[in-house]
UniProtKB/Swiss-Prot annotation:
Tissue specificity statement from the Swiss-Prot or TrEMBL entry: Widely expressed with the greatest expression in brain, liver and kidney. Detected throughout the CNS, including the cortex, hippocamps, thalamus and various subcortical nuclei of the forebrain and midbrain, the granule of Purkinje layers of the cerebellum and the gray matter of the spinal cord. High level detected in lower moter neurons (at protein level).
One of the Pfam families matching this protein, by short name: HAP1_N
Gene Ontology cellular-component terms listed: cell cortex; cytoplasm; early endosome; mitochondrial membrane; mitochondrion; nucleus
Localization of this protein: Cytoplasm; Nucleus; Mitochondrion; Early endosome
Region (Interaction with OGT): 655-669
Gene Ontology MF, one: GABA receptor binding
Name of this chain's protein: Trafficking kinesin-binding protein 1
Highest taxon listed in the record's lineage: Eukaryota
Disordered: annotated segments: 472-492
Organism lineage string: Eukaryota, Metazoa, Chordata, Craniata, Vertebrata
Length: 939
């Protein structure tokens, strides 16, 4: 109780330095124990509605006045050393504090009592805390000590167990010694048996020395044995060491050898590695090459397959073309036969239709497309209107029927596409020419023996198209230029069928025509007007390409002259004259179309066009070698006058010259009429490129072009196709037009080419000199050609009397030759069919002062077979024998000036006088072979 009283005594602890409590009230009620104390916010316990305060007092320091409890009541530095009894009693006192709750309730309204109770509670709590701290400290100390003691006890237990084990071991050892001692002294043991527990110590003491001595002896003996064993082991060890050393030396030696081998092997390995690397590179390179070669092989295989396919296709195409070619050759032969028959029929019809008493020269050397030819024809027609003809009505009906059939044939002609059938290209297709070749018009009559040589110019084509215009109707309006028919059509079969009908009609009337022809020939012979050989009573003096009793298919196949505007009835039937045909043709050419896109234009260069690498300035003469000639010359002397000369090799065919290409044009269409008193004219040609090889059909006679460079007529069907666009120089002359213009006081320039001297000076064979440089048939790219330094110009020299120039036809030349030589001409010297009674050229010649020479001898008709060419005879000697398609160099009677490069355009020379009254001498001229070779291609 004394302790409790002591604790309850209020003891005011002094506040520590810096300690202060502050009470701050939210209602501005400040309760302070000093002026500088902090404010404290408290909650009043007297009333429930009092404002709340926040305590801002520092609990570490107490207060210095009695209004507040000064804490802590016990200094932290005070050491409370209480005994266990004190602590126990104090705790009991604390447990009795619950009894004071009622006291506090009773004194609730007494502030002082409550304060004192709170102070007591504070002191009790603080004291209890101090007691608890001291107890915890003591408990911790005791716990640590207890753990330490437990560890020590564990160690002690281990030591005790070890000691016990050692003690047991020693006890067993002692028992062992004791048992051994008992065995050594059995008597003593037996006499005086001792218990174990009692005699153990004495036995140890008794036997200790003996056992030790015995053990010492045993140890010494054992030591000696061990020493001997050690010596033996040492000796063995030395032996083993020596062996080991020897073994080591051997190993070192082997190792050294192995190192040397390893070094050498390493070097070899390095070399092998390098070789392997190099070989690997080579293998890689070879593999790449193999891959490339495989790719190339695949590409080559693919290409090979393609080429094989192309080759197969080419072979199939070749076989097909060969079969088509055979068919075309068969059709060609059939068409040729029908063509010859149609030509003969047409000629006979013309003979029957028109009387032979007043036939004028229809065509001079004017081309079909020239205005001069139309002027001449118009004038002649006006003159003919004065003397009307009265032909037989039956013959007119036959003519009308023939023309009607021909129009049907023209309408059904084939439109097979051909590179020549291009509108505006001045050409027509071969098939078009084939089926329209038999059309007889006043302006164009074509006779020929070889349809492969057929090419129609645009003039003739326009006439044929106008002829069929009435029959075709609106069909022509749907056709566009340059749009031919499709291949394989039945046009050819239809045309052949119609031609076969015409052939039957012809065969039925042929006999009548032949009888009528013989009757006329007899009448002419009786009158003494027949002076030449094979006479054909037609208006064509050169139409020898017929089968007749007098000329068995002579070499002049296709050299037919036609009457242009002399036949008004036929003109009304075939072509109604609507203005100028030439102007109409020019109007067609002026219409824009793509037909002539491949034709060259002067001053216009086609994009991508390349000319041939040939010398354009080279000029070829007739005496040059052909590339296929053997160099043999046919002797011009010693030939019989009327003996046919056979040439077995005249049918030689050279397909390498069958191609041609038009690159230059020499079309001299002019109205200048050749007059003896005019000036000379010089014409210089201009070439775009060299012509392609022309077809050549000769192998013996050199310098014989296939087609005439300059012919005084329109080329026939057979001749004009020999070269697709034959080179000709169109220089027109007309005897009739000259006379008509002269009567009206019109004169023109003089063309006096040296080669036109057809009159000759004496014997033509004896006066032959190689002065002419005419154009050979060999193309410029031929290896047998003779180049010239510069391109010659058209230079005409007057080497003959002036009246030679306008007499450009063959009969006129013969007449002049007769006049100059003043001697008659044998009847065998003429191979042309001339109806003397129908010629009025002599009347015109008389007006120029030329006497008429009449030979009343009978005409001797030479016979020619198909394998023989025609025979030309000069006045005094044998004529020159010509191969098919050739022309003799002498005289060049058909008007090719010296040095003229061949014209690549088609317009040809139109025949001169058709009916003449004088015999004709054909000493040197254009002769077509009896049989033209078959061409392998229509191109």
């Amino acid at each position: 109780m004394a302790l409790a009283i002591q604790l309850r005594q209020p003891s005011r602890a002094q506040p520590l330095p810096g300690l202060s409590h502050t009470l701050a009230g939210t209602d501005s009620c400040d309760v302070c124990n000093s002026t500088n104390l902090p404010e404290v916010e408290i909650i009043s316990l007297l009333e429930e509605q009092l404002p709340h305060y926040k305590l801002r007092a520092d609990t570490i320091y107490g207060y210095d006045h009695d209004d507040w409890l000064h804490t802590p009541l016990i200094s932290p530095d005070a050491n409370i050393d209480l005994t266990t009894e004190q602590i126990e009693e104090t705790l009991k006192y604390f447990l009795l504090c619950a009894e004071r709750v009622g006291q506090m309730t009773k004194t609730y309204n007494d502030i002082d009592a409550v304060t004192r109770l709170l102070e007591e509670k504070e002191r009790d709590l603080e004291l209890a805390a101090r007691i608890g701290q001291s107890l915890l400290k003591k408990n911790k100390t005791l716990t640590e000590r207890n753990e330490l003691l437990e560890e020590q006890v564990e160690h002690i237990r281990e030591e005790v167990s070890q000691l016990r084990h050692e003690l047991s071991m020693k006890d067993e050892l002692l028992q062992f010694y004791t048992s051994a001692a008992e065995e050594s002294e059995p008597e003593s043991v037996c006499s005086t048996p001792l218990k174990r527990n009692e005699s153990s110590s004495s036995v140890q003491n008794y036997f200790h020395l003996d056992s030790l001595q015995k053990k010492l002896k045993d140890l010494e003996e054992e030591n000696v044995v061990l020493r001997s064993e050690a010596c033996q082991l040492k000796t063995e060890t030395i032996t083993y060491e020596e062996k080991e050393q020897q073994l080591v030396n051997d190993c070192v030696k082997e190792l050294r050898d192995a190192n040397v081998q390893i070094a050498s092997i390493s070097e070899e390995l390095a070399k092998k590695t390098e070789d392997a690397a190099r070989q690997q590179e080579e293998i890689t390179h070879l593999l790449s090459q193999i891959v490339d070669l495989q790719k190339k092989a695949k590409s080559c295989a693919v290409e090979n397959e393609e080429l094989v396919q192309h080759l197969g296709a080419a072979k199939d195409a070749q076989r097909q073309l060969t079969a088509e070619l055979r068919e075309l050759e068969d059709k060609y032969a059939e068409c040729m036969e029908m063509l010859h028959e149609a030509q003969e029929e047409l000629k006979n019809l013309r003979n029957k239709t028109m009387p032979t008493s007043r036939r004028y020269h229809s065509l001079g050397l004017f081309p079909m497309d020239s205005l001069a030819a139309e002027i001449e024809g118009t004038m002649r027609k006006e003159l003919q209107l004065e003397e009307l003809e009265s032909p037989d009505i039956t013959h007119q009906k036959r003519v009308f029927e023939t023309v009607r059939n021909v129009n049907q044939v023209v309408k059904q002609r084939s439109l097979t596409p051909s590179p020549m059938n291009i509108p505006g290209s001045n050409q027509s297709s071969a098939m078009n020419s084939l089926l329209s070749s038999c059309v007889s018009t006043p302006r164009s009559s074509f006779y020929g023996s070889d349809v492969s040589n057929v090419v129609l110019d645009n003039k003739t084509n326009s006439i044929l198209l106008e002829t069929e215009a009435a029959d075709l109707g609106n069909e022509d309006h749907n056709k566009k230029p340059g749009t031919p028919g499709t291949p394989g059509s039945h046009d050819l079969e239809t045309a052949l069928r119609r031609l076969s009908l015409r052939r039957e009609n012809y065969l039925s009337e042929r006999r009548f025509f032949e009888e009528e022809q013989e009757r006329k020939l007899r009448e002419l012979a009786e009158k003494g007007e027949l002076h030449s050989g094979s006479l054909t009573p037609t208006e064509s003096i050169m139409s020898l390409g017929t089968h007749s009793r007098f000329s068995e298919f002579t070499g002049f196949s296709g050299m037919s002259f036609s009457s242009r505007s002399y036949l008004p009835e036929k003109l009304q039937i075939v072509k109604p004259l609507e203005g100028s045909a030439t102007l109409h043709h020019w109007q067609q050419l002026a219409q824009p179309h793509l037909g002539g896109i491949l034709d060259p234009r002067p001053g216009v260069v086609t994009k991508g066009f390349r000319t041939l690498d040939v010398d354009l300035d080279e000029v070829y003469c007739l005496n040059d070698f052909e590339e296929d000639d053997t160099g043999d010359h046919i002797s011009l002397a010693g030939l019989a006058t009327s003996t046919p000369i056979q040439h077995p090799e005249t049918s030689a065919h050279h397909p390498g010259k069958c191609m041609s290409q038009t690159n230059s044009t020499f079309t001299f269409t002019t109205c200048r009429i050749l007059h003896p008193s005019d000036e000379l004219t010089r014409v210089t040609p201009s070439l775009n490129s060299a012509p392609a090889p022309a077809c050549s059909s000769t192998s013996h006679l050199k310098s014989t072009p296939v087609a005439t460079p300059c012919t005084p007529r329109r080329l026939s069907l057979a001749e004009s196709f020999t070269n697709v666009r034959e080179s000709t120089t169109t220089m027109s002359t007309s005897l009739g037009l000259v006379w008509l213009l002269k009567e009206r006081g019109i004169s023109a320039a003089v063309y006096d080419p040296q080669s036109w001297d057809r009159a000759g000076r004496g014997s033509l064979l004896h006066s032959y000199t190689p002065r002419m440089a005419v154009i050979p048939s060999t193309p410029p790219n031929s290896p047998m050609q003779t180049p010239s330094a510069s391109p010659p110009s058209f230079e005409f020299k007057c080497t003959s009397p002036p009246y030679n120039n306008f007499l450009a036809s063959k009969p006129a030349s013969s007449i002049l030759r007769e006049v100059r030589e003043k001697r008659p001409v044998r009847s065998s010297e003429s191979q042309t069919d001339v109806s003397v009674s129908n010629l009025n050229l002599v009347d015109k010649v008389r007006r120029f002062g030329v006497a008429r020479v009449v030979n009343s001898g009978r005409a001797r008709i030479p016979t020619l077979t198909e394998e023989q060419g025609p025979l030309l005879c000069g006045p005094t000697g044998p004529a020159q024998a010509l191969v098919p398609g050739g022309l003799v160099p002498e005289g060049l009677p058909l008007g090719c000036p010296s040095g003229i490069r061949r014209n690549r355009s088609f317009p040809t020379m139109v025949g001169s006088s058709v009916q003449m009254r004088a015999p004709v001498i054909l000493t040197s001229g254009i002769l077509m072979g009896a049989k033209l070779p078959k061409q392998t291609s229509l191109r």
